[in-house]
Amino acid sequence: MAERRTRSGGAAQRSGPRTSLTKPSKSSKRKSGSDLPNSFSEIWPRTTPAVPVRKAIVLKKIVAHAVEVPDVHTVRRSPRISFILEKENNPPLKVPTKEDLFKTCSVPGTPSSTPVLYTQNVEPDSGEAELDSRDLEMSQKVRRSYSRLQSLGCASTSTPGRRSFFGFEGPDDLPGVSPVVCSKLIETPKVPAKDLVPARTKDLVPDSTKDLVPARTLPGISPPVVKEKRKKKVPEILKSELDKWAVAMNAEFEAAEQFELLIE
């Protein structure tokens, strides 16, 4: 027992220093703030900074074009007349200058010494004389058209209760023209009834209205005479013939029912 204990003690003594020699040290050195830049240089190697390149940028400012206005403002006769009196399909070869524009806009037929603005007042008396003669002529034409009304005193029809008889001397002439007036006032020449009324309707019209019936047989205007359609005569079938026909049909039906149809 003592030997075992000594052996175990010796083994323990021997194993003690062995464990202390083989045990690795887990402690690591912490890097301070002064050592950080050295560590970054180890990770990322230093590179020389590239030289900055300058690029030229062009900035353009949009400015409105200066409008060239001619020095002398000429009075244009009409806004439709253009400065360049040329056709669109035949453009001019040279660019027109201010002098060319001034020449084309000048009014033809007027001297260069006289101004353009005073051309409207040339010979005012002749224009007034023409207008007066034309007014006189037109007034005479108008008076002719209304002279008939003025003589009768019926030119004004603005009053609602006043009747106007345009083209007639008075109300006595109206019954002979107006169809609305009673038929007793109408004096028509008596025409024989044969000429006015057709042969078929002659007996139907009473004697009092025979004179008032207008002629309906006008060539090219009156409607065509409609003829009465005649009824077709249906042939009568005797009862004895119907009975014979029924007996024959019944016999045929009975023969068809008694027929024996054999199917193998």
Curated annotation (Swiss-Prot):
GO terms of biological process kind: cell division; double-strand break repair; mitotic sister chromatid cohesion
Localisation: Nucleus; Chromosome; Cytoplasm
Main localization (coarse): nucleus
Post-translational modification Phosphoserine, affected residues: S20, S32, S34, S78, S82, S106, S222
Motif (KEN box): 87-89
UniProt modified residues of type Phosphothreonine: T97, T110, T114, T159
GO MF: protein-containing complex binding
Location of region: C-terminal Sororin domain: 242-264
Post-translational modification (record): Phosphorylated. Phosphorylation, as cells enter mitosis, disrupts the interaction with PDS5A and relieves the inhibition of WAPL by CDCA5.
Record's keyword terms, sorted: Cell cycle, Cell division, Chromosome, Cytoplasm, Mitosis, Nucleus, Phosphoprotein, Ubl conjugation
A single cellular component GO annotation: nucleus
UniProt superkingdom: Eukaryota
Domain characteristics, as noted in the entry: The KEN box is required for the association with the APC/C complex.
Family under the similarity heading: Belongs to the sororin family.
Quaternary state and interactors: Interacts with the APC/C complex. Interacts with the chromatin-bound cohesin complex; the interaction is indirect, occurs after DNA replication and requires acetylation of the cohesin component SMC3. Interacts (via the FGF motif) with PDS5A and PDS5B; the interaction is direct and prevents the interaction of PDS5A with WAPL.
Task of the protein: Regulator of sister chromatid cohesion in mitosis stabilizing cohesin complex association with chromatin. May antagonize the action of WAPL which stimulates cohesin dissociation from chromatin. Cohesion ensures that chromosome partitioning is accurate in both meiotic and mitotic cells and plays an important role in DNA repair. Required for efficient DNA double-stranded break repair.
Protein name: Sororin
Species of the source: Mus musculus
Organism lineage string: Eukaryota, Metazoa, Chordata, Craniata, Vertebrata
